[in-house]
Amino acid sequence: MISIIDDDRSVREAVKSLIRSLGYEAVTFASAEEYLGADGAHESECVITDVQMPGMTGMDLQDRLIADGYRRPIIFMSAMSAEDTGATAASRFLRKPFSDERLIDCLDRALKSPPPNSCRS
């Protein structure tokens, strides 16, 4: 299962549609808090999250997941550059807007290699 977290519904739905077309189960959440409150959230094979969201940011979510023992890939999405968001060089990062091919490549590399691994665009 791939979890997609973004406060923009159109982004959530577009990413979910692409992920499902690749044969993965995908679930969406409008906020980091909604994701954390969901049953089985920590069972995600990968989390794809927006960086800038109301309430808990994507970076805050990463910190929380790591503290809770989550050791699977996290891919960040943002209209800002990785440097402007505070994403580290080791973070998986997609700058919006990104192509389907870019997301597919980043997801493929994230799922095939242990964190961290960069796939910047």
Language-model features, listed with the residues they occupy:
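Two-component/phosphorelay signaling modules centered on CheY-like receiver
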Residues: 9-27
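Acidic, metal-coordinating helix/loop segments flanking the phosphotransfer/catalytic sites
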Residues: 28-46
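Acidic catalytic/metal-coordinating carboxylates
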Residues: 30-31, 57-60
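Conserved phosphotransfer cores of two-component systems
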Residues: 39-42, 64-71, 83, 88
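Active-site residues of response regulator receiver
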Residues: 50, 78
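Receiver (REC) domain active-site loop signature in two-component systems and cognate sites
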Residues: 53
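Alpha4 helix (beta4-alpha4-beta5 surface) of REC/receiver domains from two-component response regulators
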Residues: 60, 80-95, 101, 105
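C-terminal output helix
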Residues: 98-111, 115-120
